[in-house]
Structures are given as C-alpha cells and as structure tokens.
C-alpha cells in the first residue's frame, strides 16, 4: 500500500479554524460499515445510533498549555513545544530556534520561568525547569493548536480545545472526537442505558507528523503513553456478556484498546505504544467509532480505512467534501460501525 492511496483534495475553506458556538453543533456523517451506506445527520443524533447496553470508551487525557515562548540567556528567540512531561520539573520538548541550544544552555521563558537544556534525544530536547512544570505551563503556556489551525491561540481555546471530561494532564493535542460532547449530551447518553469507561492516552505532537515514506508498511509510529485499567477490561467483558457494542470515542481510544489487546486478548496495560493500524490489521475490541475527519495521507485516515474499509472510507470523505463538512480538530464528526470484511487499496478493481 502506498501513502498516495490515502490522498484526497480538500478545499482550504473546509478546514475548521474555530470551534462552533456549541460543542454539539457539529454535523455527523454516519457510515454503516457492513453496507457502506451514508447518512447525513447532526451530532446529537448520535443518540439514535447508540443502544442500551453499549459501552462508550473515552480518552480522559487533558491537554496542557504546552507551547512556550522565550529566549536563550545568551540571546536569540525560541519556541518550546513540550512533547512529554517526565516528572515534576523535567520535560522532553521540541525547540525551534535559529540555532539549537546546547547542553547547559539556559532558557528564559516569556512571562517568567527558567529552564536548562540538560540532554538531547534525537530531535527532542530534555529541559529541566527551576519550578514545577505543570503550574508553570498553566501560568504562561499557550494551547498547542495544530499547525493547520494557522492562528494564534485565544482564551477560548483553553476551554474548547479540551474535552469536558478531561482529567489526566499530559496531552499536547486534544482527542478531538470528544470535543463534541457536552454535559447535557452525556447525560442523555447515560439515560439511554449506555455505559461509559475511560482510558488515558497522552496524545503527542507526533500525531501531526506527515508520513515520509512511500509504502505505508515502512512507516514507524511515534510513541505515546497510555493506560487501560482493569476497570476498563471488566467493563468491556460485561458489555460483551450483555450483547452490547464497544464504541470508541476517537482514534486514541481505538489505539489504546487495540494496544492492550495486541495478542487478541484484552488485558490491563500501562506504558508506551507505537501501534500502527492500517488496512489489513484486525480489530480485537472496537465495534463502532466516533471520529473527526482526518488529514490526507495521515495515519489516522489509514486507521479509519482499516476499520470501515478503504473504498467505503474514501467514498465517505468524498461525500463529506461535496456536502461541505468541516474538517480536522474543530470540525465535524463521523459515526462508523465496523466493516466485517474491510478491503484495502490493493483490493480495488
């Protein structure tokens, strides 16, 4: 399979650069996996597609204000994007500067704060701050909006580029499928008899990195930390026992659950994952998926194609463009049921 198989034309006007007035105000494109049939709905209509006894699995990671601006003590402006918090004072970060800081260099943070560059790990810099990292980021950090939202972050992004159920700080990108849910909709879902469970996957900036190989089988995924607790395993077993479906909210929830079931058996898991899901890979846990519209040639589009089938996914994306759906993080959503016999690009006539 080639990366180019997952390309499509997207007008710039369809890239959502701001959230809608209401979280639930998005549109919902429903793709029936077994038939490929499409339905054009509004996001609250998701209720019509959920059944009593289903289990929705959400990612409760919390986006940290991971972008910092500052300068080297020796002079020269720079930008820091925290990739991973290592402990209370140390992070791994991307540093953008005219000249990369050397080990021992001191970084002065705009708004107050100081860090030392203590090591370099390939493209990432290990920084040690003089004060606790998370309070510092909350005080002077900026929300790390994706590169395709080409505007400075605004005060509203602190709330809207965050799910209402976010708990565990550590992500530098939002699990965007969850942005559509407000408390009122969650209450209606619960009232219908749909259970919920929470995993954690701290989304890294690598989620926006382009695939730089021709054959997707040659691509190596970035690592992200996740946790699937025993409570989630128990909830899924109970869901199966009552005949319910496991509905993953977002590709990060899919990657969490499928990482914890790599040998075909779901087990509690905590640690790094570099799982890469593309057409041909089986799914062991997830039956249905809520997800946003993803970038052309992205690993997330490949995951959706593995779940729904390649021709069905690309046809759905073509329909979304034709009908003016809004794309990417602040855009519209899909609800997809798993295709029991998904085809890949190589299966096309």
UniProtKB/Swiss-Prot annotation:
PANTHER family: S-ADENOSYLMETHIONINE:TRNA RIBOSYLTRANSFERASE-ISOMERASE. Its EC number is 2.4.99.17. Keywords: Cytoplasm, Queuosine biosynthesis, S-adenosyl-L-methionine, Transferase. It is found in: Cytoplasm. The keyword Protein transport does not apply. It is an enzyme of class 2 (transferase). InterPro entries: QueA, QueA_dom1, QueA_dom2, QueA_sf. GO terms for cellular component: cytoplasm. Gene3D superfamilies: QueA-like. Belongs to the QueA family. Monomer. Transfers and isomerizes the ribose moiety from AdoMet to the 7-aminomethyl group of 7-deazaguanine (preQ1-tRNA) to give epoxyqueuosine (oQ-tRNA). Pfam families: Queuosine_synth. GO terms for biological process: queuosine biosynthetic process; tRNA wobble guanine modification. One of its GO terms (molecular function) is S-adenosylmethionine:tRNA ribosyltransferase-isomerase activity. Pathway: tRNA modification; tRNA-queuosine biosynthesis. Its main location: cytoplasm. NCBIfam families: PRK00147.1, queA. It catalyses: 7-aminomethyl-7-carbaguanosine(34) in tRNA + S-adenosyl-L-methionine = epoxyqueuosine(34) in tRNA + adenine + L-methionine + 2 H(+). This is S-adenosylmethionine:tRNA ribosyltransferase-isomerase. It comes from Pseudomonas putida (strain GB-1).
């Amino acid at each position: 399979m080639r990366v180019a198989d997952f390309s499509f034309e997207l007008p710039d006007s369809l890239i959502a650069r701001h959230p809608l007035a209401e979280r639930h105000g998005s549109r919902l494109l429903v793709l029936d996996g077994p038939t490929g049939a499409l339905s054009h709905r509004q996001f609250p209509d998701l209720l019509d597609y959920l059944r009593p006894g289903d289990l929705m699995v959400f990612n409760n990671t919390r986006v940290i204000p991971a972008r910092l601006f500052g300068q080297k003590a020796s002079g020269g402006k720079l930008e820091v994007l925290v990739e991973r918090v290592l402990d209370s004072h140390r992070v791994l970060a991307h540093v953008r500067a005219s000249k990369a800081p050397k080990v021992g260099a001191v970084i002065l943070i705009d708004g107050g704060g100081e860090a030392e560059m203590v090591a370099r790990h390939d493209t990432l810099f290990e920084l040690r701050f003089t004060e606790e990292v998370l309070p510092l980021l909350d005080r002077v950090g900026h929300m790390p909006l994706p590169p395709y939202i080409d505007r400075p972050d605004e005060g509203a992004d602190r709330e809207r580029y965050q799910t209402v159920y976010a708990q565990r700080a550590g992500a530098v990108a939002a699990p965007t499928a969850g942005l559509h849910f407000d408390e009122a909709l969650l209450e209606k879902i619960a009232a219908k008899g749909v259970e919920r469970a929470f995993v954690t996957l701290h989304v890294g900036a690598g989620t926006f990195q382009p695939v730089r190989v021709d054959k997707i089988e040659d691509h190596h995924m970035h690592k992200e930390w996740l946790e699937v607790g025993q409570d989630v395993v128990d909830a899924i077993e109970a869901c199966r026992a009552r005949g319910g479906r496991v509905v993953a909210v977002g590709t990060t929830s899919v990657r969490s659950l499928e990482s914890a079931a790599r040998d075909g058996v779901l087990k509690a898991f905590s640690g790094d994952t570099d799982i890469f899901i593309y057409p041909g890979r089986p799914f062991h846990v997830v039956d249905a998926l809520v997800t946003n519209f993803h970038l052309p040639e992205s690993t997330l589009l490949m995951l959706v194609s593995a779940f729904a089938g390649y021709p069905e996914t690309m046809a759905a994306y073509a329909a979304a463009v034709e009908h003016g759906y809004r794309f990417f993080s602040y855009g519209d959503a899909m609800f997809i049921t798993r295709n029991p016999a998904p085809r890949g690009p190589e299966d096309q006539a």
